[in-house]
């Protein structure tokens, strides 16, 4: 048993202001303040062929804030079916342009990480084929005893997304615009339940890039701390984790010192050291395999549940983590059902006189 320090290096890699506040500047606070749909909205519809850029986003914000003879009141939205469609179009293009801009620093960090790993250009373009995972499983999982099939929880409340990114980006304009887009999406979903035949329901299908950015930022927050503690507690092998690390779009080691709330983790930081443990994440699930005992796997299960609840404020049901013995159970991975075959051998001994 060992106790780990309550400090670790955390890379808040873009704490300075973004470029886009210099572009939008005077529009962001007015737009974020008015997210309850009580302002005037333009009636005319502008088609941009699903193309998003900072210039398009700025023009849309300008037209949404202007008032002329083409505007209608939000109270008249029930009488005019085109109002909701135009509002959704603006929110969609703004969120798409927002996602493009905020992906820039993450892309730069990914390129820097690839250069540090000295990956050749041909491999960099493909970012490690997914088929390389299966030889890894065949070579390593046959020597393991237990595997935990983990369903990664996702924050339900919108404000948790803002809190997660607040420690990454020290930019008030960024947080205001993010909060506006999230509440705008929530309002559209509420309206879609009342008017299912209208075009409001297309918002969830059209903003995939924006929500993919939010999901990856949340996963990066979770994995950066989790992998650090795994390295401290169980010597998680970099070669095992490296099979998927190039495919994690927002991976990066963190540099700024922050304090883990020691009171929250006082009961779960006591972990047994295990010389062999592997972690693999795919889609919204993860696999944690070990050569340890059932008690060790239960300790990790207890730790993960408390980690999500205490640090990320995400409630996780313990039944979402299944612990199985590889010799008796199989586990699903990337659409395949994997299991370990137990080879029984007969040993004969003869007494020598």
Curated annotation (Swiss-Prot):
This is Maturase K. Keywords: Chloroplast, mRNA processing, Plastid, RNA-binding, tRNA processing. Belongs to the intron maturase 2 family. MatK subfamily. PANTHER family: MATURASE K. It comes from the Eukaryota. Its main location: plastid. One of its GO terms (molecular function) is RNA binding. It holds the Pfam family MatK_N. The keyword rRNA-binding does not apply. Usually encoded in the trnK tRNA gene intron. Probably assists in splicing its own and other chloroplast group II introns. The keyword Transit peptide does not apply. GO terms for biological process: mRNA processing; tRNA processing. One of its GO terms (cellular component) is chloroplast. InterPro entries: Maturase_MatK, Maturase_MatK_N. It is found in: Plastid, Chloroplast.
